[in-house]
């Protein structure tokens, strides 16, 4: 007599088999473990930073009477660049005493909620002030003269020698008649950097009417950070992958050779760098659809640099009004996918 199973028992058997299958395959079907963030560094401001109610009109008046400039140190919790710059220049190092002698240093957290009365009399939260000042990298250093005018802003980490140039530029009030790059060029005699090649570099002299993603890298012979940029960032595999949508051009920011810039104007690399207001070498300006979409004016480690490239190359800047907003969403997505994120060098 043939063996048969009625419908009721068949359903029960299938349920048992499915339960057994889930038990055996559970690990494979389990949710992907979240990724981890490494490379963040906790930091604290030195105790000699000025205690402030963040009313910068009052701070300017005090600085004016003392004949000093104000240095606003804008940082972010667990920022490795902030920690390094504080350690090398404010907690110790040759710049420490120079800064203490000549500047009133006031800390502002770019994600903070404290109320700030800025030099123009307007009131902001710390976070809104960072947006107003277009802070795209931390630390950002904002220098204010005794008359209450912003005279220089540095977005991103600077090495101690590079920062020293900026400190002396402000203290000497050289900002009255020249740019920071011109000031450095006059002071620096012996070249610090020999230009390096890269397989992605193209020789371009006419940038007009170019509407695809374009990365223009400005370097010069006095660039203290350019060699490290090539070694640790520009040749990193993750960065090379995000460079694929870009046409990449390196220009000597001191060169006087004729070129046509992105707007169609006849100019030179020197004049173009000056018109862009670049304060750092290497200065990386990212263009798309014939206009500037983002720039990098401080040292970034490979993760943040490749995400800046993706921000423009993937045209995410069309969806997000700020890189920081894009980056927050991007990091959440990567961690959700189980990707580890390394903020370190």
What spans do the regions from the language model cover?
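Hydrophobic residues within membrane-embedded alpha helices
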Residues: 13-14, 57
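Positively charged n-region of N-terminal signal peptides that target proteins for export
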Residues: 1-13
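Bacterial N-terminal signal peptides
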Residues: 15-24
